[in-house]
Amino acid sequence: MANIRKTHPLAKIINNSFIDLPTPPNISAWWNFGSLLGICLILQILTGLFLAMHYTSDTTTAFSSVTHICRDVNYGWIIRYMHANGASMFFICLYMHMGRGLYYGSYTFTETWNVGIILLFTIMATAFMGYVLPWGQMSFWGATVITNLLSAVPYVGNDLVQWIWGGFSVDKATLTRFFALHFILPFVALALAAVHLLFLHETGSNNPSGIPSDSDKIPFHPYYTIKDILGALLLILTLMLLVLFSPDLLGDPDNYIPANPLSTPPHIKPEWYFLFAYAILRSIPNKLGGVLALILSILILAIIPLLHTSSQRGMMFRPISQCLFWLLVADLLTLTWIGGQPVEHPYIIIGQLASILYFMILLVLMPITSIIENHILKW
């Protein structure tokens, strides 16, 4: 009798994706983040589902319902904090995963890379709308400021903003639609993740050397399943340490004040994982220019495959490019810091310089460096 794992229509798909999948023998821990992202997504959907059972998307009761979850629902506090900090873990894994793709040239799998960018936008939209739901001060004002950016769109801007708000300000209609979209988008992300994997398994995984490994592959199970389980345990350990010891470490204290349209917080800022983009937005003293820079800071990833000028795939054997990559990481950390600071000297100029450097590294310095390295190799 044939092995059911290899013959059953459904089991066959799982087998070819997670068990008998031919995998390069030399992929490092940087390749763990894909599976960790899958775990994060499932964890967020499960905790979110239980939160949605008790949450009410009405401006008068939203804040109270979150308080009720934390105080009265059995283990509601841990579900709420796992969901909030799970989002932070999600973005940490996401940025690591993208960094790995940039460093090792995984963007040359253009279909996989482009689906990944769409996934990133989906998850960013989901996280933004989730931040609005507790209906605290930062929720309300964050929603007001970020949705208001759409008014910079020529001709239709104001109509677009009012259409998204469902009125003339962020109110009950906005909260209700944000809850509906926040609930549905993770399932869209789940479907996109399946497409992401589908495209990846068409080409097979990249590896640190960037050299094709078709002649030397090992099965995914047991070698990488055990490695992924170790990664998952470390992820859950980190998450639970965060949840149980300092659940509000990454949150904003202002969100414990109920939303008040008559009182503006001294410093409106999004969650920490959006601060780099927020800093780029603020670094341009023009509304439309800032919005364009904000969108381009993410969309720039789509043209990375076109800017690949190196004769080698990854950066493993390209020390000058490695220096530039880590400069980019440092620049993004600087932007994240600036995004959380008030708009005053010297933060304004630091933010502007860091924003210029971000685009310079990706659009100019990296392609030129790759060409120089190609010539050095021929000496």
From Swiss-Prot:
Q: Which residues bind heme b b562?
A: 83, 182
**How the cofactor binds, per note?**
Binds 2 heme b groups non-covalently.
- Entry GO terms, CC: mitochondrial inner membrane; respiratory chain complex III
Q: Which residues bind a ubiquinone?
A: 201
Q: Which cofactor does it need?
A: heme b
Q: SUPFAM superfamilies, from UniProt?
A: a domain/subunit of cytochrome bc1 complex (Ubiquinol-cytochrome c reductase) (SSF81648), Transmembrane di-heme cytochromes (SSF81342)
What residues does heme b b566 bind to?
Answer: 97, 196
Give TM segment ranges.
33-53, 77-98, 113-133, 178-198, 226-246, 288-308, 320-340, 347-367
Instruction: Specify one Pfam family.
Output: Cytochrome_B
User: Any idea which GO molecular function terms this record carries?
Assistant: metal ion binding; ubiquinol-cytochrome-c reductase activity
- Which purpose does this protein serve, as stated in its record? Component of the ubiquinol-cytochrome c reductase complex (complex III or cytochrome b-c1 complex) that is part of the mitochondrial respiratory chain. The b-c1 complex mediates electron transfer from ubiquinol to cytochrome c. Contributes to the generation of a proton gradient across the mitochondrial membrane that is then used for ATP synthesis.
Homology family: Belongs to the cytochrome b family.
Extra remark: Heme 1 (or BL or b562) is low-potential and absorbs at about 562 nm, and heme 2 (or BH or b566) is high-potential and absorbs at about 566 nm.
Which PANTHER family does the protein's record reference?
Answer: CYTOCHROME B
Name of the protein in question: Cytochrome b
Source organism of the structure: Mirounga angustirostris (Northern elephant seal)
